[in-house]
């Protein structure tokens, strides 16, 4: 049994388009091709009936969608929400109300002409035998079909088949699947001091600890500016670098329109000059916002140090993720918090604040009200009742956890015996995150809430 000639012609036309276009998504391409052919044929049929002054025929639903009906060429295709991934836009409106056909307008025009002059029956041609052959007036007028309403379509009729998303990849390496290390550029001690001075007053760096600051300073890359008049950043461009001026000066220009215009005055008005030790472009470390000004070197032999947004955020993320894991491990060892779920421990870890103490500094005073709980991140400390040392603390130890239960005065003082860094959490912050501690204690029937609790913490009043 041979295939119908009309079918062979359609397949040949499809093969020709595939060879010319080489689409990456063959199913989408074929669907667009046949939908376009169907729309072209039916649009031509409707136009023919309109020219003859006869009512348009009632087309049957598409075999691929029972809700698919047409009265004109302007209807909504299930692919209408997508841009055509196989070619540019066509000058002719797409009868599917969305993406352009994979065929160019000239190909579409040629297909229409071929259809009009072709003696072979196209797919669905038998449906119009009464209209195309003989006297249409001798037959009963075809039944008209009202345009379909949006309620008749499936809920996701125009749902996008595919969506592309692009973003910067920021995955912590502490999970063990990435060996990323921060970039590092050698600098002299004098350069490090100048750079540290330049960033210490910037709000983006004010919350960094010593380790993060050292990584940020090490990641700065030198950018020599050899001549005067070199444009470092342009107003309106997307920002992705933060700059610190080590040597030289840079003029700042702002155009009220928000971008550089052609002409001698296109830079706008000069609003200031950035000298050595200054910085600019810090907003680029948070998001790629358009530059608010144009920066141009005001002299030759200038030196800049640059830091890109991805490195900055990756350094913060790596250190923050590692510190959170450390805090969570510490919190697992606190008896009063043993009933917390991993999610609750994670919330507390994010709320902990870091404090530093030099050797000999008093962390808490005997007799003071207890408002905070402490985790020892690094260093060593000792607890004293009067002049007598009663306990010593090392990395990972904790003290003052009963401050989460009540505000009883401290029973002892804790003094740093070396450089100490502690993570602290107040009772108010704890209750704001997880509610009253008493509820957590009830979950594990924590013994000692009313009796024997003083044995849990040497800093509790005897």
From Swiss-Prot:
Reply yes or no: does the keyword Coiled coil apply: no
What cellular component terms from Gene Ontology apply here? cAMP-dependent protein kinase complex; cytosol; nucleus
Phosphoserine carried by residues = 164
Q: Which Pfam families match?
A: cNMP_binding (PF00027), RIIa (PF02197)
User: Which residues are 3',5'-cyclic AMP 1-binding?
Assistant: 204-333
Region of interest (Disordered), ranges: 79-157
This entry's Gene Ontology molecular function terms read: cAMP binding; cAMP-dependent protein kinase inhibitor activity; protein kinase A catalytic subunit binding
Q: What SUPFAM superfamilies does its record include?
A: cAMP-binding domain-like
Q: Where, by residue number, does 3',5'-cyclic AMP 2 bind?
A: 336-453
InterPro entries noted in UniProt: cAMP-dep_PK_reg_su-like (IPR050503), cAMP_dep_PK_reg_su (IPR012198), cAMP_dep_PK_reg_su_I/II_a/b (IPR003117), cNMP-bd_CS (IPR018488), cNMP-bd_dom (IPR000595), cNMP-bd_dom_sf (IPR018490), RmlC-like_jellyroll (IPR014710)
Q: Which UniProt keywords apply?
A: cAMP, cAMP-binding, Nucleotide-binding, Phosphoprotein, Repeat
Q: Which parts of the sequence are annotated with region: Dimerization and phosphorylation?
A: 54-203
Query: Bias category Low complexity: which stretches?
Result: 80-102
Q: Which family does it belong to?
A: Belongs to the cAMP-dependent kinase regulatory chain family.
What do we know about how this protein assembles, alone or with others? Tetramer, composed of 2 regulatory (R) and 2 catalytic (C) subunits. In the presence of cAMP it dissociates into 2 active monomeric C subunits and an R dimer.
Q: What is this protein called?
A: cAMP-dependent protein kinase regulatory subunit
Q: Which organism is it from?
A: Hypocrea atroviridis (Trichoderma atroviride)
